[in-house]
């Protein structure tokens, strides 16, 4: 019920308007949601970057004392508070009004984030809307704030998804909404190589097929030029310094 309220009427209207666009019926969102849900609750300090109307603070069973920091634009979080109407979270929820292109790190730490503790970072439905340079700088900032044992969860679309003609109606739709897709890669592991994180990139089709939610053949990654998306789980191993420290 909380999730439906956060979506608002316009959320359902957008979903209806998007029906019939290429690949829109693929079960990407529910499969991604379950994948992240199973991993997020392992942490006692969680940061949602570009949190939007995420309802996990209210619907998941959290460890005692867990803190969930929700980072997003001030106007987004203000609308979220209005729609929540006083609903109580199941954790210590900490809204952090900040722009990810600005000084969000200072805002996060001022709200009580403790970089010496392992964290779970969630970049859900975010990276595809950012330029590649911003994607890399954002990951470097996350690395600098992460203690050993921290986890990062993200979804990444394949490069083919940015240009294939069959997706043009969907690209036109999101562009009109002011949210064009900007970033994709067929090798998401390479984003983390400079950071030294241990990363596993799961093909969405494989994850969905294992869950009985995929109606199409799963195409091996060695076959290029195919539309695909990835669910990424990365962990910062012990003994790793922040990437920024290595450069000094």
Task: List each language-model region with its residue ranges.
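Rossmann-like AdoMet
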Residues: 1-47, 53-98
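A short, conserved alpha-helix within the catalytic core of class I
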Residues: 103-106, 129-144
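Short amphipathic alpha-helix with an adjacent loop that forms part of the alpha/beta core around
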Residues: 105-115
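A short SAM/SAH-binding and catalytic strip from SAM-dependent methyltransferases
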Residues: 118-134
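Conserved beta-strand signature within the Rossmann-like core of class I S-adenosyl-L-methionine
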Residues: 120, 146-160
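Short, glycine-/aromatic-enriched active-site segment of Class I SAM-dependent methyltransferases
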Residues: 163-178
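Short alpha-helix
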Residues: 179-204
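Core SAM-dependent methyltransferase catalytic element
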Residues: 212-248
């Amino acid at each position: 019920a909380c999730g439906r309220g956060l979506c608002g009427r316009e959320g359902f209207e957008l979903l209806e308007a998007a029906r019939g666009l290429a690949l829109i019926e693929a079960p990407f969102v529910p499969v991604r949601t379950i994948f992240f849900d199973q991993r997020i609750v392992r942490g006692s300090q969680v940061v949602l970057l570009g949190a939007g109307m995420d309802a996990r603070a209210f619907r998941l069973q959290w460890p005692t004392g867990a803190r969930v920091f929700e980072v997003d634009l001030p106007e987004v979080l203000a609308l979220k508070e209005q729609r929540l109407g006083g609903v109580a979270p199941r954790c210590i929820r900490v809204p952090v009004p900040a722009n990810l292109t600005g000084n969000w790190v200072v805002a996060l730490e001022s709200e009580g984030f403790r970089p010496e503790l392992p964290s779970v970072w969630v970049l859900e439905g975010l990276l595809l809307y950012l330029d590649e340079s911003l994607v890399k700088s954002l990951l470097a900032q996350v690395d600098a704030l992460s203690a050993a044992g921290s986890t990062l969860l993200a979804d990444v679309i394949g490069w083919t998804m940015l240009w294939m003609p069959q997706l043009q109606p969907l690209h036109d739709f999101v562009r009109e909404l002011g949210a064009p897709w900007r970033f994709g890669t067929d090798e998401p592991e390479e984003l983390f190589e400079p950071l030294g994180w241990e990363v596993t990139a799961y093909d969405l089709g494989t994850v969905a097929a294992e869950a009985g939610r995929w109606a199409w053949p799963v195409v091996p990654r060695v076959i290029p030029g195919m539309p695909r998306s990835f669910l990424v789980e990365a962990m910062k191993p012990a003994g790793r310094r922040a990437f920024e420290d290595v450069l000094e």
